[in-house]
């Protein structure tokens, strides 16, 4: 079940459920600013506002660059709709027409709890991206246009997940959240696109990704490095017992007891 796979990803991100704004409810995430400095509309005084192609292209370039740099290619797409505003059949028709997507692999009715605690009827559409031809930039452009001249149904309603897990959520032309199961998973994105991080959240994000990590104690023997005691003990045992046997008073089991702190389980000279 794709819905179950999606929920497992959400749990892996440290959340019980999707809760907006996603960045504020996830332990590890980065919020990027997508819209650039160009004006959104060509002429704000016109009777009918016309979207500025340069603004749209700039936002698309940023969103697509981050998408291509994700830890892996997303393998699951979820798009939410709200049947109280538009019937589910009509929603799906619009989604398929604008995106060129096939019939979803799963369609699930649900109840959404919003930020104010109010409930809303919802329908969730799921696609297994590994089995279809998918044009991510077409989807990203539709989301970007949602609030500035496109179809608003894509705004804050599209989620892409992949192994890790991670979640990619372009919510509109202004911003994008990328959530991860660990800071190590998102560290390459943090470094590569640090200049695009939303300034309002920059200090908070920097604290997460630059915090000192506890250093693992390392051991070296015969030029080999070990990051855990078990591997180190195994190598010590190999080096110090090489060529010895119980006949000359060195029993490997007894030596292993002493080495690992478990004295008294074997006697020296006891055959192996």
How would you name each of these model-derived features?
Residues 159-211:
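Alpha-helical oligomerization segments
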Residues 1-150:
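Extended, low-hydrophobicity segments enriched in charged/polar residues
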Residues 150-164, 254-263:
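A short, acidic, amphipathic alpha-helical segment used as a generic capping/interface helix at domain edges
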Residues 85-89, 133-135, 167-169, 184-189, ...:
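Short, surface-exposed beta-strand/loop "edge" segments at domain boundaries and coil↔beta transitions
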Residues 107-114, 119-123, 127, 227-237, ...:
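Acidic (Asp/Glu-rich) sequence patches and key acidic residues
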Residues 211-246, 250, 254, 262-272:
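N-terminal intrinsically disordered, low-complexity segments enriched in P/E/S/T
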Residues 65, 69-72, 145, 195-198, ...:
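Short, intrinsically disordered, mixed-charge
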Residues 38-47, 74-78, 120-122, 169-177, ...:
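Glycine-rich, often proline-containing surface loops adjacent to acidic residues and nearby aromatics
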């Amino acid at each position: 079940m794709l819905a179950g796979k999606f929920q497992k990803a959400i749990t892996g991100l440290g959340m019980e459920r999707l809760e907006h704004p996603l960045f504020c409810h996830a332990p590890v995430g980065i919020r990027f600013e997508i819209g650039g400095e160009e004006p959104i509309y060509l002429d704000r005084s016109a009777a009918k506002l016309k979207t500025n192609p340069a603004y749209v292209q700039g936002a698309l370039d940023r969103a697509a660059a981050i998408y291509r740099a994700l830890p892996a290619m997303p393998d699951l797409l979820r798009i939410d709709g709200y049947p109280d505003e538009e019937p589910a059949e009509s929603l799906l028709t619009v989604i398929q027409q604008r995106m060129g997507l096939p019939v979803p692999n799963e369609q699930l009715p649900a109840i959404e709890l919003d930020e104010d605690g109010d409930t809303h009827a919802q329908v969730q559409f799921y696609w297994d991206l590994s089995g279809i031809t998918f044009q991510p930039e077409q989807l990203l452009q539709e989301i970007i246009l949602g609030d500035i001249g496109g179809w608003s149904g894509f705004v804050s309603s599209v989620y892409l997940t992949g192994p890790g897990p991670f979640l990619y959520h372009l919510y509109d032309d202004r911003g994008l959240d990328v959530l991860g199961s660990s800071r190590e998973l998102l560290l390459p994105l943090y470094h590569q696109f640090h200049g695009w991080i939303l300034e309002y959240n920059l200090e908070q994000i920097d604290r997460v990704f630059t915090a000192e990590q506890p250093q693992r104690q390392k051991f070296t023997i015969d030029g080999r490095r070990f990051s855990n005691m078990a591997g180190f003990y195994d190598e010590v045992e190999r080096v110090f017992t090489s060529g010895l046997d119980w006949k000359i008073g060195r029993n490997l089991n007894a030596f292993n007891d002493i080495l690992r702190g478990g004295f008294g389980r074997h006697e020296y000279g006891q055959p192996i």
